[in-house]
Amino acid sequence: MSSGGLLLLLGLLTLWEVLTPVSSKDRPKKLGLCPPRPQKPCVKECKNDWSCPGQQKCCNYGCIDECRDPIFVN
């Protein structure tokens, strides 16, 4: 590959990195722990903590992903 091609590739990669939106994976998790698993059918209510309102966390219980108020353990 020519030096011009390498510079173009480097420029495109840099631009892609700058323009890539911040994903939820880069955000810190919310404080607290998820409460015990609820007894209910499978439901996918959320994808991550930031898809839940307020202080609620996206809690995964196998086939259940739902927004729940966190519990805090000392």
From Swiss-Prot:
Instruction: Name all WAP domain ranges.
Output: 27-71
- By its UniProt entry, which InterPro entries does this protein fall under? Elafin-like_sf, WAP_dom, WAP_four-disulfide_core
Enumerate the subcellular locations listed in this protein's record, separating them with semicolons.
Secreted
Alphabetically sorted, this entry's keywords are: Antibiotic, Antimicrobial, Disulfide bond, Secreted, Signal
- Major localization listed first in the record, in broad terms: secreted
Q: Where is the signal peptide?
A: 1-24
Q: Does the keyword Glycoprotein apply?
A: no
Q: Which GO terms describe its molecular function?
A: serine-type endopeptidase inhibitor activity
Cysteine pairs forming cystine bridges in this chain are C34-C59, C42-C63, C46-C58, C52-C67
Gene Ontology CC terms: extracellular region; extracellular space
Coiled-coil residues: none
What PANTHER family would the database entry show? Answer: ELAFIN, WHEY ACDIC PROTEIN WAP
Cited function: Damages membranes of susceptible bacteria. Has no hemolytic activity. Not toxic to mice. Does not inhibit the proteinases elastase and cathepsin G.
Q: What is the protein name given in its UniProt record?
A: Porwaprin-a
